[in-house]
């Protein structure tokens, strides 16, 4: 969440910045809650002062041997009033907390202003799209002859799922292993294995809850309906990785913390009805290698550029043409202050499609998680958190299938993946 002191000091300025994100801050509602909070706290202080004064009177009366029953009764009554005030304050504080959790992060001053993806700014293009001397086929047609099957997946589960068999399944696995090895050996990340099911506190910490519950898959525990707390399938490994530091105070010299994980991701794709219904671009279940960094606040934008470079390195090694864009204010994710999207060239679509999103969240997630470090003065201070795809495995497979397809229906395997494929250099159509 954003710093509440910013609202208390200059709420109109905050509202103006949020307007660039297409978010209308309810200034009147916040001011009303703040006024109620101040009134309760002021009356509480008055009651506490009155109780202290009366307590001193009781001591003086006892010293004189006089009757204290009336004053003690008054003190008891004040105690009841204080309990009622505390209960009222808890209710108001809960409303303020709920209000704060609904507010997206403030965009960094360097982020271009825009209402949607049309306002995004291209930073660079890397690699030249290949020229084909035969009719280009999309990954669905190429993959069908190599063991990619959507019909069987639909029978097993439903739409937006896939089954892979044989060489294409191995290629999918090879991509994930290659990404992990690159991030750990070359980029300094620690590989992690995390739960694929998380609690609501974890999702609130990274910003998916309470606002985006419709995008999640909730888990119903067999035979335990109604028992315990709600659990959810992870929409990204960002959630468990980032929550490793929830409710922690880490040593300043332990920063930066770099973590990576390969996991399945599960998304309901609410609001995506009718979009990318063909193929693997938008599925309910997909694999991703995630990068997360927990850094000193002064280092987070340096880390953002570094992480973008780490994701780019994967694409360069695979020989896939791509571009980097800076998202505008109206197209950024809820928790981000600045985001770079990497888009890979898909020849069958004749366009670039997102394959990675790398974001700096500054202290937005850290405040929600109470994730802190000890600064040079030894005082706890919020860390900054960053996350990024390094990369989405399924979409990378799509890009390899389309960019490396051959006229005979085979797919040449990028050289960097040969060691992961047992030396296999080409996938050929299955008989």
Swiss-Prot record:
Among the GO molecular function terms of this UniProt record, one is: serine-tRNA ligase activity
What pathway is this protein said to act in by its record?
Aminoacyl-tRNA biosynthesis; selenocysteinyl-tRNA(Sec) biosynthesis; L-seryl-tRNA(Sec) from L-serine and tRNA(Sec): step 1/1
Give the primary localization class. cytoplasm
Which PROSITE patterns does the protein's record reference? AA_TRNA_LIGASE_II
Cellular component terms per the entry's GO annotation:
cytoplasm
Positions with a binding annotation for L-serine: 236-238, 290, 389
Q: Name one GO biological process term.
A: selenocysteine biosynthetic process
HAMAP family recorded for this chain? Answer: Ser_tRNA_synth_type1
Q: What family does this belong to?
A: Belongs to the class-II aminoacyl-tRNA synthetase family. Type-1 seryl-tRNA synthetase subfamily.
Protein name (Swiss-Prot/TrEMBL):
Serine--tRNA ligase
Taxonomic source organism? Janthinobacterium sp. (strain Marseille)
């Amino acid at each position: 969440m954003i710093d509440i002191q910013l609202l208390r000091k200059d709420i109109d300025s905050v509202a103006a910045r949020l307007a660039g994100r297409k978010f209308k801050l309810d200034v009147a509602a916040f001011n009303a809650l703040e006024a109620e909070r101040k009134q309760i706290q002021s009356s509480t202080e008055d009651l506490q002062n009155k109780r202290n004064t009366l307590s001193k009177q009781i001591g003086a009366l006892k010293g004189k041997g006089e009757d204290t029953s009336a004053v003690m009764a008054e003190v008891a009554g004040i105690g009841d009033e204080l309990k009622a005030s505390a209960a009222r304050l808890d209710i108001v504080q809960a409303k303020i907390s709920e209000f704060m959790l609904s507010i997206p992060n403030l965009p960094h001053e360097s982020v271009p202003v825009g209402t949607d993806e049309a306002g995004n700014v291209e930073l660079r293009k890397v690699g030249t799209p290949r020229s084909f001397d035969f009719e280009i086929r999309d990954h669905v047609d190429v993959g069908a002859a190599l063991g990619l099957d959507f019909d069987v997946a639909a029978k097993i589960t439903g739409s937006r799922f896939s089954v892979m068999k044989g060489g294409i399944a191995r290629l999918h696995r090879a991509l994930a292993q290659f990404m992990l090895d690159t991030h750990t050996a070359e980029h300094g990340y620690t590989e992690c294995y995390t739960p694929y099911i998380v609690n609501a506190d974890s999702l609130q910490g990274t910003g998916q809850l309470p606002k985006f519950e419709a995008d999640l898959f909730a888990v119903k525990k067999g035979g335990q309906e109604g028992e315990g707390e709600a659990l959810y399938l992870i929409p990204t490994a960002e959630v468990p990785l980032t929550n490793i530091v929830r409710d922690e105070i880490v040593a300043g010299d332990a920063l930066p913390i770099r973590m990576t994980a390969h996991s399945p991701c599960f998304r309901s794709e609410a609001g995506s009805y009718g979009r990318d219904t063909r193929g693997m671009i938008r599925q309910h279940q997909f694999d991703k290698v995630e990068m997360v960094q927990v850094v000193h606040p002064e280092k987070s934008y340096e880390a953002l550029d570094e992480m973008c470079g780490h994701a780019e390195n994967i694409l360069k090694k695979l020989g896939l043409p791509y571009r980097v864009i800076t998202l505008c204010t109206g197209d950024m994710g809820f928790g981000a202050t600045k985001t770079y999207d990497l888009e890979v060239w898909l020849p069958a679509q004749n366009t670039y499609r997102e394959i990675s999103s790398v974001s700096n969240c500054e202290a937005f997630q850290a405040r929600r998680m109470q994730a802190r470090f000890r600064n040079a003065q030894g005082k706890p201070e919020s860390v900054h958190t960053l996350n990024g795809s390094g990369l989405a495995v399924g979409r990378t497979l799509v890009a390899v299938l389309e960019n490396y397809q051959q006229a005979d229906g085979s797919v040449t395997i990028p050289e960097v993946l040969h060691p992961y494929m047992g030396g296999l250099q080409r996938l050929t159509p299955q008989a």
